[in-house]
Amino acid sequence: MSPSAVDDAPKATGAAISVKPNIGVFTNPKHDLWISEAEPSADAVKSGADLKPGEVTIAVRSTGICGSDVHFWHAGCIGPMIVEGDHILGHESAGEVIAVHPTVSSLQIGDRVAIEPNIICNACEPCLTGRYNGCEKVEFLSTPPVPGLLRRYVNHPAVWCHKIGNMSWENGALLEPLSVALAGMQRAKVQLGDPVLVCGAGPIGLVSMLCAAAAGACPLVITDISESRLAFAKEICPRVTTHRIEIGKSAEETAKSIVSSFGGVEPAVTLECTGVESSIAAAIWASKFGGKVFVIGVGKNEISIPFMRASVREVDIQLQYRYSNTWPRAIRLIESGVIDLSKFVTHRFPLEDAVKAFETSADPKSGAIKVMIQSLD
């Protein structure tokens, strides 16, 4: 049974699509960044020859640059995940289905989808208990050695492609960072009226702030070292209180100033989105007795924390690894307008200018919140 694939001028949502050469954004252990030919080839996209059972071919439209993408480029690793050869980046993507294997019935050519960037084994305990983010054999796109989504075309299992209807391509790509925040909210168990601290006004911190606000956190405080990022936080969430972190202060001193921003109330839950040792320590010092510090951010392999402060105050410390079962919820939140990410994309680049896009994302002076790469016109 041969795959059902696009022709040289395939139809999708009523318009002809020409298949261009497939190119991708690569890095390597030498920290080079470049654009080169990628798989599947244009010929394979046209014929559907590379499609496996259960897969569809997606013409990627928009991909956001994540901090982890920049980290793999600059550092060559995140913990034990090491770039060992030529490696394609990107895992925040949405696009259009342009070819469907005959075994797939859930999607058809022309469907607009967001790509959940993992492939799991469906056999290990985490998979069988619904926590597939802990899959022992997971292939997470853009995490070495699995190539990422910063390409024009990609084959992906249909089960991990979520229909987004008329949602914009950019919002479809932003479902991935929203899923990170939702996973944190779900496990941190933020409740109506909880005083919530969000550490870090980067994309994940900002999305987490919006989620906490939607969940009824009150009061709500967000911290950062950047005045411009805090101003952006206030713009998209007027009721948040912003708190600029002063570099050089001890964690205990920082905690006291944070509690002052709460009006003397100690946070019940902290959504720590930086992974920075000093920020985690300050959050522990600031927490109420029986409070929780939930670490979403990615940090160093080993850090020091104020252990006895956490002990005598019974502060729960939890951590997060990616997400599971969040995408349908994320889609509903954006479609309904409960979460508005329309201002998040501050910079846009075509795929051909991806190197400049990465330089912009990595430059603190650029003012970038989310840099979006558009793979196709």
From Swiss-Prot:
Transmembrane segments: none annotated. Its EC number is 1.1.1.12. Induction: Only expressed when grown on L-arabinose. Pathway: Carbohydrate degradation; L-arabinose degradation via L-arabinitol; D-xylulose 5-phosphate from L-arabinose (fungal route): step 2/5. Pfam families: ADH_N, ADH_zinc_N. Binds 2 Zn(2+) ions per subunit. It catalyses: L-arabinitol + NAD(+) = L-xylulose + NADH + H(+). The keyword NAD applies. Gene3D superfamilies: Medium-chain alcohol dehydrogenases, catalytic domain (3.90.180.10), NAD(P)-binding Rossmann-like Domain (3.40.50.720). Its cofactor is Zn(2+). One of its GO terms (molecular function) is L-arabinitol 4-dehydrogenase activity. It is an enzyme of class 1 (oxidoreductase). Optimum pH is 9.4. Active from pH 7 to pH 11. Zn(2+) 2 binds at C121, C124, C127, C135. The N-terminus is blocked. GO terms for biological process: arabinose catabolic process; D-xylose catabolic process; galactose catabolic process; L-arabinose catabolic process to xylulose 5-phosphate; sorbitol catabolic process. Homotetramer. This is L-arabinitol 4-dehydrogenase. The gene is lad1.
